[in-house]
UniProtKB/Swiss-Prot annotation:
Top-rank taxon: Viruses
Coiled-coil region(s): none
Any one GO molecular function term: DNA binding
Pfam families attached to this UniProt entry: Chordopox_RPO7
Protein name: DNA-directed RNA polymerase 7 kDa subunit
Amino acid sequence: MVFQVVCSTCGKDISHERYKLIIRKKSLKDVLVSVKNKCCRLKLSTQIEPQRNLTVQPLLDIN
């Protein structure tokens, strides 16, 4: 599971491509072959976050 990612320029959902990168561990070069918009390619290339443990809910610290 990955967090939903939408390109801020064109509005396209690029979560599936991010799933391939993080979960399936495909190379960025292989994933970018199927992405046609330059803005989406740039977002995938520059804003990759490491895989998170999604079973733990974050706690709010209000001080």
